[in-house]
């Protein structure tokens, strides 16, 4: 079985906490194949692992958030999403009946800059729907910019090639404060 761990800013770069748990899981299942999809700030972290990777880690894919290609927004050449693409985006933002196959297809096949997407009409309308349905007591401009900030790293990661695996597990810390 191929198991892909998706880890942001922890394993295999830093010791302790989530990283220790991931390392223990990999070592305790030597007959399973593990793939790491790591999300780090920039290329300075590339290959600088705090752990010696076990033999059953067969691939490490590093995603560098600093590599975001903003592109430019051309006001005369606005990119509009078709109905299926818009529904995929909207369902993701509303976290309602997300059709992941459509989401992945959209981010892998649509040639659009993150800047065009986040500053475009379609993202605006999907966020406006979320705002009206769930958060009308918040100042809309604050909500819109917060959503842009939150979705930028997710959209960037969705645009990268996801390694093939049988199981995907995103590891994270949970802060109770």
Positions of PLM-derived features:
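Long, low-complexity, polar/charged, intrinsically disordered or flexibly structured peripheral segments
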Residues: 96-162
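Short, flexible loop segments at the rims of nucleotide/cofactor-binding pockets, characterized by
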Residues: 12-14, 144-148, 167-169
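General secondary-structure edge motif
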Residues: 2-5, 9, 148, 160-164
């Amino acid at each position: 079985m191929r198991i892909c761990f998706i880890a942001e800013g922890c394993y295999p770069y830093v010791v302790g906490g989530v990283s220790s748990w991931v390392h223990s899981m990999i070592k305790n299942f030597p007959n399973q194949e593990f793939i790491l999809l790591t999300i780090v700030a920039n290329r300075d972290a590339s290959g600088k692992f705090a752990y010696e990777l076990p033999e059953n880690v067969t691939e490490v894919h590093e995603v560098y958030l600093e590599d975001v290609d903003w592109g430019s927004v051309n006001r005369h050449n606005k990119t509009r999403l078709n109905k299926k693409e818009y529904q995929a985006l909207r369902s993701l933002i509303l976290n309602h009946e997300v059709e992941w196959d459509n989401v992945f297809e959209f981010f892998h096949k649509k040639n659009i800059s993150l800047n065009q997407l986040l500053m475009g009409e379609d993202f605006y309308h999907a966020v406006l729907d979320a705002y009206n349905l769930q958060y009308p007591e918040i100042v809309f401009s604050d909500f819109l910019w917060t959503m842009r900030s939150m979705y930028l790293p997710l959209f960037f990661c969705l645009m990268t090639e996801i390694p093939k695996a049988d199981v995907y597990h995103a590891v994270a810390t949970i802060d109770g404060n």
